[in-house]
Amino acid sequence: GCIAKNKECAWFSGEWCCGALSCKYSIKRNLKICV
């Protein structure tokens, strides 16, 4: 299944973030997070 650790964005079976609609870039964490 889809796994998005620590709210990071993941792509699995045509969906981002285990069902989240989109992702945004977090400068503070230096990674993309689920929105």
Swiss-Prot record:
One Gene Ontology term of the molecular function aspect: toxin activity
SS bond partners: 2-18, 9-23, 17-34
GO cellular-component term (any): extracellular region
Tissues of expression: Expressed by the venom gland.
Subcellular compartments: Secreted
Secreted in keyword set: yes
Record flagged with keyword Lipid metabolism: no
Keyword entries, A-Z: Disulfide bond, Ion channel impairing toxin, Knottin, Neurotoxin, Secreted, Toxin, Voltage-gated sodium channel impairing toxin
Function per UniProt: Gating-modifier toxin that inhibits mammalian and insect voltage-gated sodium channels. It shifts the voltage dependence of channel activation to more positive voltages. It shows potent activity on Nav1.4/SCN4A (IC(50)=103 nM), Nav1.5/SCN5A (IC(50)=268 nM) and Para/DmNav1 (IC(50)=555 nM) and lower activities on Nav1.2/SCN2A (IC(50)=1447 nM) and Nav1.6/SCN8A (IC(50)=3504 nM).
Domain comment (free text): The presence of a 'disulfide through disulfide knot' structurally defines this protein as a knottin.
Family the entry assigns: Belongs to the neurotoxin 07 (Beta/delta-agtx) family.
Additional comment: May be interesting for the development of therapies to treat the periodic paralysis hypokalemic 2 (HOKPP2), since it inhibits I(GP) leak currents of HOKPP2 p.R222G/W channels.
Protein name as it appears in the record: Mu-thomitoxin-Hme1c
Species of origin: Heriaeus mellotteei
Lineage: Eukaryota, Metazoa, Ecdysozoa, Arthropoda, Chelicerata
